[in-house]
Amino acid sequence: MTLCIAWKQDNAIHLAADSRLTIATNSYADVGIKVLALPYRILQPAHPDPSRARNVAYQGRLGMCFAGSAVNSLMIKESVAAVLQDLQYAPGYTDVSLKGICEFIFKAYKLISIEICKTAAGPKGIASFIVCGQCPSTSLLRAFKFSTNSNNVHSLDEVLVSSNHEFLGSGAAHVDPKAALVRNRDYLSVLRDMIDDESIESVGGNIQYGTLHNNDFTVYGIIEFKDGVHHWRGALDMNSDYFMSAQSDLISGISYIDPFNTFGRSSAV
């Protein structure tokens, strides 16, 4: 499983997660990408003249974070990413709110989840996730949780409405309900402490983090000072010699945050 955290603060929505994938019983790999940006595009109706280019009515980048089955999460992620870039709407009829977009995603989620849970994976094939974005209809920042219970009943619920945060995954049961969660760093500290707690086997690896500002979700790498300086994006240390040794190689252009003041300076969050 995992721990994913969504919270609303400073006119933004933040998503964070660990990197651990549960492969089988007592078998883990800290290589999952659980926080990601998901571009979407909604096109105007097709023009009668097929040679005319389609106009884009709405577009942006949603944020997503996953918990649960690695197989289910991957299939949902791949399927949804493929179709969200070419949606179409009918003016006056189609719901182009963020809820409408999430209801479209929810249809794919149910279909894929049912098929995965029919296999030998059974209940272990269950996955849950959160999607956040700026609503095309209202320009408000909103977030929705996609979940499945033990009876394979699927739910779509808006979150970050009555509460400023939402915890998702097996790690949620270990969060101290009395924890003081005020700053962005407080949420990341909860995640870091759980990753460092070896008694919580389902949560581990490196922190992943992204922020939704206006209509754009940006994923950041994490700077860590531990046996040297590391610049993590999931399991990948992007500034390591492995990636930086050849002058002719492409390098990562991702931005990084230093949430725990590794170098004694203010963090980006």
Residues of each region from the PLM?
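N-terminal nucleophile
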Residues: 1-269
